[in-house]
Amino acid sequence: MCHPEARRRRGTSQTQAKYFFARAYIDERSLAVFAARDDGGDEFRMNAIIACGGTGGHLFPGLAVAEVLRARGHQVLLFVSEKDVDALALKEHPEIPFEKLPTIGLPSPFSPAILGFVRRFNESFRRCRSIYRRFKPQVILGMGGFTSTAPVLAGKMRGVPTFIHESNAIPGKANKMTARLVRAVLLGFKECAPFFPKVKTEVTGTPIRTELQRLDCKDAREKLGLSADITTLLVMGGSQGASGINQAMIKSLPSLDGARLQVIHLTGTRDERLVADNYRRAKLPAFVAAFHHRMEELYSAADFAVARSGAASLAELAAFALPAILIPFPYAADDHQARNAEVFVKADAAILVKESEILDDALAQKILPFIEDHGRLQRMSQNAAKLSTRNAASAVVETMEKYTTAAV
């Protein structure tokens, strides 16, 4: 059934950096956009760089900020990674120009891969400097991850106001490296502030995309071919799927036999057919897809979720008042997904289950109480809604505007 809360909510130094040879390429489409900027009038307009990408957890909040900046009349250029996940998501936003940077994650200092990291970082740094000479940014925002490091450093050396956003409850390596270069560190969780004791911090929440607005629950279920009045579980593994969660659901299907439940399951590319076949054999109603571009449909149709606990996913779950069974990615840096999940557990908006604990039908034993106790489901939904920061993108933009001057 569509729970009551768902029905209510519709709605480096400059002297060391010699003049690099090799100029970066900017595609004609981007240059055409920038050439068309309106310099007339008294209203403040910024050229803004947002460095995001590499995972959906960096990219989607960056896109959300870009949407608000553009709505306020600012020019925006995204810096993203060369990963397929970025290209796939940006196909849905052809109006936002972007550049790809060849950065990779920071390997161990003793790994042979460190040489490749340095080469790619230098290439990204040179490309940023070339683009900045043309675009003349007035503000730069890094969303974390090593796609953001070179742009923030190049911006600092140019004297441009720079900011970083840390969505997680514990900061990543890239943001810890660049924090002292920026005007302010913007936070998704207040619990992260103690990690930046010598830097100004502001808690904004984690931005979510403007299209993520609640739809009518029954209409959303109808679009997915599901029944209007059956408790609906959303299973998702983040922007790249999660084989561990997929396998746990498959093992749990026999124990869910006879439960008044239907499932929306995003599998990622590799497991889509396998998962769909298992739902059919179990005769459990399900909408199964590798990915889905209209996530607002899925969130609106669901009563609760099984999910990873990346910061972007948690922000979206809270925006739709969805309580969750959270299974943190066990190999996340510094176990940050577990720290994120703990915030929601403390608020009684989620339960935390380690991936090592979802053996046999263990996941089913966590799912069944949500189906059987609607009072608990409603209470946890209300608690999840209290964690929502739907205005986070606007808060990020307002902070950027506050610290930034119009001087070019």
Map each language-model feature to its residues:
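A cross-taxon signal for low-complexity, glycine/charged-rich
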Residues: 6-14, 18-19, 24-41
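C-terminal alpha-helical cap of glycosyltransferases
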Residues: 389-408
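Active-site-proximal region of nucleotide-activated glycan assembly enzymes
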Residues: 75, 96-97, 156-218
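A short, well-ordered alpha-helix in the C-terminal region of glycosyltransferases
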Residues: 376-390
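An amphipathic, basic-hydrophobic alpha-helix
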Residues: 108-139
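Conserved nucleotide-sugar phosphate-binding/catalytic loop shared by glycosyltransferases and other
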Residues: 47-53, 70-120, 271, 356
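Donor-nucleotide binding loops and adjacent catalytic segments primarily
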Residues: 84-94, 217-305, 338-342, 346, ...
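Acidic donor-binding loop of glycosyltransferase active sites
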Residues: 137-139, 292, 300-315, 322-323
